[in-house]
Design a protein with these regions (language model features):
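N-terminal intrinsically disordered/low-complexity leader segments
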Residues: 1-9, 72, 76-80
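Short, leucine-enriched amphipathic alpha-helices that occur as contiguous helical runs
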Residues: 7, 11-15, 19
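Helix-turn-helix
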Residues: 13, 21-55, 59-63
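Alpha-helical DNA-contacting segments of helix-turn-helix folds
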Residues: 58-64, 68-71, 134
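Hydrophobic alpha-helical connector segments
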Residues: 73-112, 159-166
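Amphipathic alpha-helical packing segments from all-alpha helical-bundle domains
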Residues: 90, 124-150
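Amphipathic alpha-helical segments used for helix-helix packing
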Residues: 107-132, 177-178
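All-alpha amphipathic helical-bundle segments outside canonical DNA-binding/catalytic cores
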Residues: 130-133, 150-167
């Protein structure tokens, strides 16, 4: 029974509108009333589907942000399959293209980046969830790819800083388009 109500169109509309409003105004900047009005739902629907505003916020990240991040990562991996053996320049180029010209439409990219920027500026429990489930595994995968291509004797900390620097530059240009 609970599963049927979770799939209702009101829940999807709430997730859609909450994502847009959270991206534009942040968690604290939007009220439950504003979200339900935008979604055309009853005020009690946030409680009914999510329990509270905080849970709705987490669900926006879980069911909207995380799948988009996985699409970007998959786009990166697919690009890498076109060239064997891998080179440092191909990894960096593929990473940049996945974030700058990747699989997201303009509206998805804008929401995705605004949500992340707001979460970084005012962290909540969502940031730890994203770090554990998306960011750390992806960053580990990236450094594992880079390790055999960098000079022998390079310290692990230097590799991590280099990878973070590359990633930061790509994100800087990607976020600059918001």
């Amino acid at each position: 029974m609970a599963e049927n109500r979770m799939r209702g169109p009101s829940k999807e509309r709430l997730l859609d509108e909450a994502e847009i409003l959270f991206a534009e105004k942040g968690f604290e900047g939007v009220s439950v009333r504003e979200m339900t009005r935008a979604a055309g739902c009853n005020l009690a629907s946030v409680n009914y589907y999510f329990g509270n505003k905080e849970n709705l916020y987490m669900e926006v990240f879980r069911y909207r942000w995380m799948p988009r991040a996985k699409r970007i990562h998959n786009n990166f991996r697919q690009s890498l399959q076109t060239q064997k053996p891998l080179s440092l320049s191909h990894i960096i180029q593929s990473l940049g293209m996945a974030f700058l010209r990747g699989p997201l439409c303009e509206e998805e990219r804008r929401c995705h980046q605004q949500l992340m920027a707001r979460e970084l500026a005012q962290p909540t429990a969502a940031l730890e969830m994203l770090a554990q489930e998306i960011m750390r595994p992806f960053f580990q995968e990236l450094t594992d790819m880079l390790r055999p291509l960098v000079p022998e004797g390079l310290e692990e900390s230097e590799l991590m800083l280099g990878a973070m620097g590359i990633f930061a530059m790509i994100l800087y240009f990607s976020f600059g388009r918001v």
